[in-house]
Amino acid sequence: MEVYVCFCYNKMRVTIKNYEKSNTIKTREGKNMETMQGKKNIVLIGMPGAGKSTVGVVLAKRLGYRFLDSDLVIQEQTKKLLHELITEHGVDGFLKIEEDINAGLDCEQAVIATGGSVIYGEKAMEHLREIGCVVYLKLSYKEIEDRLGDLTARGVALKNGQTLKDLYNERCPLYEKYAHIVQECDHKRVREIVHELASQANA
């Protein structure tokens, strides 16, 4: 039996299914990527600090899409902040909650900014790839390091003893694995990134 939880987010009706609380481009490696055309949504993935929410808001406005921040959806559904969920449930417990909610997202014509740890949920990523074009906002480690402040306050899912560098090295291959498009973002302004992505969407 499918369970649907409906609520309004940012004036948009979002449906969460089965959630219970408890034009082609290539990367530098030559990997073929799918076009944004024909996709219902655009899904942004990447490290914390990569600019997913910032780029997402501007890109949504440019395309006439709605904007959805999956971290805020998680907080809306659980009534708790991300760092509170990590403290209460541990990293693994938080990742399970995140995966369940992201795997049930159901919306159209939206730019979805995801949490940096979304790629640990295989079920969620398969679903997001089905409902949208997944775009990896790729930044070098130095750029990420310069941008980030207190990781704990940001609700970053760090395991005991894990450093930001460890996290970066662990996650980057997963971002590459799930992305339809890899968008290089080093030394680029938000408007430049948005222009490049919008050009792909309208190609």
Residue ranges, per PLM feature:
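NTP-dependent small-molecule kinase module
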Residues: Y9, M33-G38, V58, R62, ...
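Conserved lysine of the Walker
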Residues: K52
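Hydrophobic anchor at the beta1->P-loop junction of P-loop NTPases
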Residues: L44
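P-loop (Walker A) phosphate-binding loop of NTP-binding proteins
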Residues: M47
